[in-house]
Amino acid sequence: MAYQPAHHDGENETLHAPISADGYAEKGQEYLIPARQGRAVKLHQGDILQITNPQGNQVCDFFALTLESSAEFLGMEQCRTSLGRVYVNQGDVLVTNRRRPLVEIIEDTSPGVHDILIACCDLPRYRDLGVSDYHDNCADNFRMALTAIGIEATHVPSPFNIWMNIPVKEDGAYSWEAPVSKAGDTISLKALADCVAVMSACPQDLTPVNGVGAVSYTHLTLPTICSV
């Protein structure tokens, strides 16, 4: 079968439980992103989206597309070029694949360890890791979260991996490590253009990126969406 960007290999409640039918949130309302699922929310330019990590060990794969065109999206390759580094800091502006500003990191209460190198997990990744059955994954969560609010994915871009800890060594090698974020950490992102943000509570359980040992997957929360 020819590759279809919007096709999901399996499904979970992401497909059936959008935050609203049209994707717009009620201002100031708290929304949950259940463990192993994703949600999409439409933002107006100037809106501030705050994401909270209740237990501290949950990675959030964050994507954003312009409302003008789903073919213009947050581009990690372009962000690395624009920033001149492979890490992000509070105050950084993240750009699209067309190099236009889309999101600004306006506050980060965590130690600031996030990733802009690693692709989102998908079913082929879990096949490589030895999984034979369906496994929840961030690529499908992205597709389903968009479908749930009436948008068809035209690409599956690399995400901004919030709280993912991928240290890079002097020789260029990197490793998969547990998050250094702590319970209750938040990150606040300001929309610099009308866009749709998609967040996946990463279900990766075969590498340490969501913690080590008996990992307790948790939800993420979106406590605040407000206009400035």
What are these regions (language model features)?
Residues 218-224:
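Conserved small/polar residues in nucleotide/adenosyl-binding loops
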Residues 56-58, 72, 101, 120-130, ...:
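Extracytoplasmic/secretory-pathway segments with low complexity and glycosylation-like composition
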Residues 3-86:
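Solvent-exposed, flexible loop/coil segments flanking beta-strands in beta-rich domains
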Residues 80-164:
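Low-complexity, serine/threonine/proline-enriched polar segments
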Residues 43-51, 189-202:
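Noncatalytic modules at the cell exterior or secretory-pathway interfaces
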Residues 57-60, 113, 196, 203-211:
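Short, surface-exposed beta-strand/loop "edge" segments at domain boundaries and coil↔beta transitions
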